[in-house]
């Protein structure tokens, strides 16, 4: 799986409308190979690794080809494969690129409709990774606005944020959807304050 980070980053300059970086099938769930090509087995990836795999494929706009037997999906795997925010990355994201690569930390960014942005941060290392960064550290453009942030995998709204403060388990990821916060023009603030006195 680690090799795919470098491979998808190298392919990205060639990704455009009508061309997709094909990272191969998603090795998630119950894998039932064609007769003569090995024994049936469950994915050898941990749950965190499966999330990382799916997040990377989606934000890089690889086709999401499920390699599992769909009739044998358990509830946990089905939840992974049907996450609406993750599917939107793959189907609606534009301008995706690897925004940062420092040691075990790799971050990708893509733009979404309605002026939203997505930021995926991966820990490719074998030990926990502490990430305390302003959004601008990943891309200067992200530092020019105020954002309402949603953790896409947890389905949790994190409120107004200017950066990331998280610890990622080995081989795990954090997928954030950033929505622009509509701020009142500064010239209106004194007027509103006076009306509420």
What are these regions (language model features)?
Residues 1-68:
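Glycan-recognition surfaces
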Residues 34-35, 65-67, 73-77, 126-129, ...:
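Flexible loop/turn segments at secondary-structure boundaries
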Residues 43-46, 105-109, 163-164:
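Generic recognition of flexible, low-complexity loop/linker segments
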Residues 52-100:
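Catalytic cores of secreted or luminal carbohydrate-active enzymes
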Residues 57-60, 65-67, 101-140:
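Carbohydrate-binding surface patches
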Residues 119, 149, 171:
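Hydrophobic, well-ordered secondary-structure elements that form the walls
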Residues 136-153:
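Solvent-exposed beta-hairpin/edge-strand motifs
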Residues 159-194:
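C-terminal beta-strand-rich structural cap/linker in extracellular carbohydrate-active enzymes
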């Amino acid at each position: 799986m680690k090799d795919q980070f470098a491979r998808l980053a190298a392919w990205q300059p060639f990704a455009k409308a009508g061309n997709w970086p094909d990272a191969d099938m998603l090795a998630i769930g119950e894998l039932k190979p064609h007769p003569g090509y090995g024994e049936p087995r469950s994915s050898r990836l941990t749950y965190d690794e499966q999330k990382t795999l799916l997040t990377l494929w989606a934000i890089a706009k690889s086709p999401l080809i499920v390699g599992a037997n769909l009739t044998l999906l358990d509830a946990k795997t089905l939840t992974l494969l049907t996450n609406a925010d993750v599917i939107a990355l793959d189907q609606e994201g534009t301008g995706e690129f690897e925004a940062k690569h420092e040691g075990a930390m790799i971050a990708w960014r893509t733009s979404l409709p309605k002026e939203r942005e997505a930021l995926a941060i991966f820990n490719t290392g074998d030990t926990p990774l502490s990430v305390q960064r302003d959004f601008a550290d990943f891309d200067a453009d992200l530092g020019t606005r105020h954002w309402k942030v949603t953790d896409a995998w947890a389905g949790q709204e994190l409120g107004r944020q200017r950066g990331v403060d998280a610890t990622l388990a080995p081989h795990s990821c954090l997928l954030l959807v950033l929505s622009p916060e509509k701020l009142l023009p500064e010239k209106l603030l004194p007027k509103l304050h006076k009306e509420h006195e």
